[in-house]
Swiss-Prot record:
It comes from Pectobacterium atrosepticum (strain SCRI 1043 / ATCC BAA-672). Transmembrane segments: none annotated. Gene3D superfamilies: Homeodomain-like. Activates ribosomal RNA transcription. Plays a direct role in upstream activation of rRNA promoters. Homodimer. GO terms for molecular function: DNA-binding transcription factor activity; sequence-specific DNA binding. This is DNA-binding protein Fis. Signal peptide: none annotated. The keyword Disulfide bond does not apply. The keyword Transcription applies.
Length: 98
C-alpha cells in the first residue's frame, strides 16, 4: 500500500510491511531503488533513453493526479506544477490524456 504526502516540500511514500508497520521515505529513495533494480536486471546490457523512461514513469501519474486534483482545470494544474498551460497541454497530449 502506497500513499504520497507533502511534508516540508518533500514527497514521501508510506509503505506497510508484513508486520503492519508503516514507514515513510522520500519518493526519491523509491526512484533510486527502482533504478537499482532496473540496472540489476540489465546484466551488463546497454540501455538508451533512460531519462525518458524514468520521466515517463513519474510524469504520467503526476499529470493524472494533478488533473484529478484540479478537476480538469488546466490553468490551475499548470500553475500548481509551475509550467505554462501550453506546456501542460503538450504533455497531456503526449500521454493521451487530453
Amino acid at each position: 500500500m502506497f500513499e504520497q504526502r507533502v511534508n516540508s516540500d518533500v514527497l514521501t511514500v508510506s509503505t506497510v510491511n508484513s508486520q503492519a508497520q508503516v514507514t515513510q521515505k522520500p519518493l526519491r529513495d523509491s526512484v533510486k531503488q527502482a533504478l537499482k533494480n532496473y540496472f540489476a536486471q540489465l546484466n551488463g546490457q546497454d540501455v538508451s533513453d533512460l531519462y525518458e523512461l524514468v520521466l515517463a514513469e513519474v510524469e504520467q501519474p503526476l499529470l493524472d493526479m494533478v488533473m484529478q486534483y484540479t478537476r480538469g482545470n488546466q490553468t490551475r494544474a499548470a500553475l500548481m506544477m509551475g509550467i505554462n498551460r501550453g506546456t501542460l497541454r503538450k504533455k497531456l497530449k503526449k500521454y493521451g490524456m487530453n
